[in-house]
Amino acid sequence: MRAQITISKQNLLYNYSQIKKLSSKEVIAVVKSNAYGLGILEIASILFASGVTFFAVATLEEAIYLRKNNIGGTILLLERTNEYALAYSYQITISIVSLSQIEDIKKSPVPVVAHLKIDTGMNRLGLSKDDINVIKNYSLTNLKIKGVYSHIACESSFMEQEKVFHEICSMIPNTNNIVIHLCSSSYLHKSPSYTTHVRVGIALYGISYIKSLILKEVLSLQVPIVRRKSVKINEKVGYDLEGIIKEEGYLYTVPLGYADGWSKDRLTIAYKDTYLMQVGKTCMDYMMFFSKNKYEEGEYIEIISPSLPCQKMASIYSSTPYELLAALSYRIKRKIIT
């Protein structure tokens, strides 16, 4: 008996429809980092079967995994790669994030299909205005530029970064025939008219940072009670015996630990309109919780649920939904419900 993730197909597709309605753009579904912990194949399969034909991933391995599992359409690789033949064989669109890549592409024995990543101020990855001027003077018959994009660092820098992006886009020939994407989940409502797509990850999964965008939670994380023990005051619990029972009741062991990506000590979990309190340190495979209420072994407790949503938990534990979700391990079983 182990932890399991339940994915709501209905809520995922609802969120997708709301995103399209708000942005009025085509959607690039970002399924990197195992679809933010929800399950890359589970999420991509639902979306592809529902007509989504553009995906973005972080690694070449993720892209190939999708192709091997019959996910069609365009797959954009966000990281830098020099494995051009491998990308070409799986019809992966790469990102050009540095001018030095152009020299590599000159030597490529196969055509390279790419999007240009523009650095508009975040200073992480991307080409500068000067880089674009250099690229314009290259004659590369094996390079096919199919898109251009950038990434916004924060709300306060949006206008400045958008201005830089627009200026650089105007320098690139034939932009009428390529994909242009700037806005991610937090900026869907600000997508400029000259862009063709929005690049959406966390919003697909029910996390909204836009007041007018009401979304539904896609993921529930449940764990079974594998052991119940009656405990008395001052009994000690867990590694280093740091946990101390403060009143008589029941100690419940659940199979979720830092090997599952649940590394922090989560102080509360919701169950049957009440909360259970964690006692002791989080172990590799287990956590222990206390309650005065008596529950049965084999019952499932929800760790993330509509009553304790991801955004609320992230706020309580001084974390972010990105961190909580993306850390969820591959070893947690994923199940799709309609």
Segments predicted by a language model, with ranges:
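Active-site-proximal beta-alpha core segment in soluble small-molecule metabolic enzymes
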Residues: 3-14, 25-179
